[in-house]
Regions:
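Transmembrane alpha-helices and adjacent helix-loop boundaries
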Residues: 1-243, 248
């Protein structure tokens, strides 16, 4: 029973990351091989504060408060997505793919080089995030939190795809030149989608860090991005059909 529960929990967590990637891949046509970076940053947002809470050092980071972990993950993954997006989105096609992968590998080698957090061997998290009324040490509650989060982000992405922003994003994917001629700021819309996609993956990383109680640079490696890509492609890039698509 515990095996299937753990499997279901892991699937829910990775599905959240896939939903985030799908926002830019399925609806924006942006093929990113760097989204594992945001997943890993979210996991490290749990592991690093917990490590300092247990063993000291960097007192301003030392905490097991789950809400603080989530805020750190959102801030770090959002900022990294902003910085990488500003550069990556100036390119297209294979160049975009390679640059997103390059940024992911930069983050990978950064954490490999930090011996305090385990380097290449990773870091065991001896305590999970603490959230009022929720015990993440309980496998059933861990699954329920992961499943509820998946439903929430699916609903949120659904709202985005049905909004004017989502329709513009779909239009950019279908015919970017036409959207430019209509006066839309294509770069801005793609950047906002890219940032939001990274934040969703960062939140998934918080859950993944709590689930595995272990973080390592392997979470950031480009091969993990490839796994997320396959999940999106096999599951169907367009989770929701936009109204514009219905009209066609």
């Amino acid at each position: 029973m515990s095996f299937y529960l753990d499997l279901a929990t892991r699937l829910c967590i990775l599905a959240i990351a896939a939903v985030g990637l799908n926002l830019i891949l399925g609806y924006g046509g942006m093929i990113s091989f760097g989204h594992a970076a945001y997943l890993g940053l979210g996991a490290y947002a749990v592991g690093i504060p917990a490590h300092h809470w247990l063993y000291g050092g960097l007192d301003f980071l030392a905490t097991t408060n789950g809400f603080v972990h989530i805020l750190i993950a959102i801030a770090i993954s959002g900022l990294f997505a902003l910085l990488t997006g500003l550069i990556c989105l100036k390119t297209k096609g294979v160049y975009f793919i390679m640059i997103t992968m390059a940024f992911s590998q930069m983050a990978y080698y950064l954490f490999v080089s930090i011996e305090e957090y385990g380097g290449d061997d990773g870091l065991v998290i001896n305590t999970r995030s603490e959230i009022p009324l929720i015990n993440l040490d309980d496998p059933i509650q861990m699954f329920l939190v992961s499943f509820s989060s998946l439903i929430f982000f699916m609903w949120l992405v659904y709202l985005i795809t049905k909004s004017n922003f989502g329709l513009i994003l779909s239009g950019i994917k279908d015919n970017e030149a036409r959207m430019v001629s209509l006066g839309y700021n294509v770069y801005f819309h793609k950047l906002i989608a890219f940032i939001f996609s990274g934040i969703i993956c960062g939140f998934a990383g918080v859950l993944l860090g709590n689930f595995t109680t272990f973080i390592s640079p392997e979470m950031i490696d480009w091969s993990r991005s490839g796994e997320l890509m396959f999940m999106v492609i096999l599951g169907g890039c367009l989770l929701y059909t936009s109204d514009a698509a219905d009209d066609r």
